Amino acid sequence: MPLKSLKNRLNQHFDLSPRYGSVKKIMPNIVYADGFNPSVGDVVKIEKSDGTECVGMVVVAEKEQFGFTPFNFIEGARAGDKVLFLKEGLNFPVGRNLLGRVLNPLGQVIDNKGALDYERLAPVITTPIAPLKRGLIDEVFSVGVKSIDGLLTCGKGQKLGIFAGSGVGKSTLMGMITRGCLAPIKVIALIGERGREIPEFIEKNLKGDLSSCVLVAATSDDSPLMRKYGAFCAMSVAEYFKNQGLDVLFIMDSVTRFAMAQREIGLALGEPPTSKGYPPSALSLLPQLMERAGKEENKGSITAFFSVLVEGDDLSDPIADQARSILDGHIVLSRELTDYGIYPPINILNSASRVAKDIISESQNLCARKFRRLYALLKENEMLIRIGSYQMGNDKELDEAIKKKALMEQFLAQDENALQPFEASFQQLEEILK
């Protein structure tokens, strides 16, 4: 059989197209090359003329060329460098041996504890749980924080956001939740954090105990692609444990820096900055990640807390607004409460858990509603009370709120090491309100 005919027949069953090409153009966050036809999401690498390599992911596929965003920085690369196809799609190691380890989004361990022994490689991008396969959120997920357990009760498989400006106490609260919950597995994604904050989070917020945790970290000096896919890699690890029938706590800090990474990539690709500098892809990326959390029938659950850095304490920020519309609840931290020395500084009047009323008893619901009503009365009349314009006896309910003010503030404040069971939080609520 002629060689040309043999090649044509083989091409019908196998992809025999070239798997290498060369760099044509280099831009700050995107490299263009030609020579073969990869698909969007494929992983390629540049062999630089100085002997080093740079791995990237294809984000643009055209007839004559393709563009990819690098995972690491491309200093030293030049036009004409060789580009090789590596694999179809990004995978990440999963398995029980990941517990206690710290990894980067490329699956490399960064904790100096030796080589990683993993079970298999799992795809980083997966389809969220089908709507009709989602289990109902009907069980309490206790986190050991009084103001959350008592007033913003979380459910197993719920997705919540922690919204706050910088320096208000998001990381401390997330550490309390991680240590206070009873989930056997905790997966933590630290995205866009300063390098020094990674060991600080482990030692200060987790008290050095990583035995039930897997931590995926992409620091602020990593490339936009590393920061973007760090969150997806961590979610793939959480899904592995969920599929084993386990209940998983997923913590991510922060969604804002995750969206900023996609903003850098989107703008490099020429997307219009439509919403306060964010291109459409940055906003559409949030549900792709967040909807992967939840409870699945005949499997386990992923209860997720996503921190959202609110620029200038503006809750109408596009990322905060988009996140709030996707999540099942929001916990708003208040700079004013921080100034008053109340920690965790949760603004219970601006916060909400959309499933709370369905997972706690009627008596617990009544307690939570009454506490919020009395606290709201205090806030509405705070100035009148301070300047002495309010006379006791004018409003029976406000009188009760004033008498219980110290006890209510004591309930909202909690030392980060004084975590307590769910039942104890409601017992304390009942004592205050009786």
Predicted segments — roles?
Residues 2-141:
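Acidic-enriched and Gly/Ser
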Residues 81-83, 110-158, 171-176, 209-222, ...:
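P-loop NTPase nucleotide-binding/switch module
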Residues 1-11, 425-434:
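Short, charged, intrinsically disordered terminal tails
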Residues 150-151, 157-434:
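P-loop NTPase catalytic core
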Residues 42-43, 51-52, 65, 77-78, ...:
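Short, low-complexity, polar/charged sequence segments that are solvent-exposed and flexible
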Residues 5-7, 86, 143-148, 234, ...:
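Phosphate-interacting basic helix/loop segments used at nucleotide- and nucleic-acid interfaces
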Residues 97-101, 149, 234:
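Glycine/charge-rich, flexible interdomain linkers and switch-proximal surface loops
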Residues 19, 27, 40, 98, ...:
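A generic structural signal for well-ordered coil/turn residues at beta-strand boundaries
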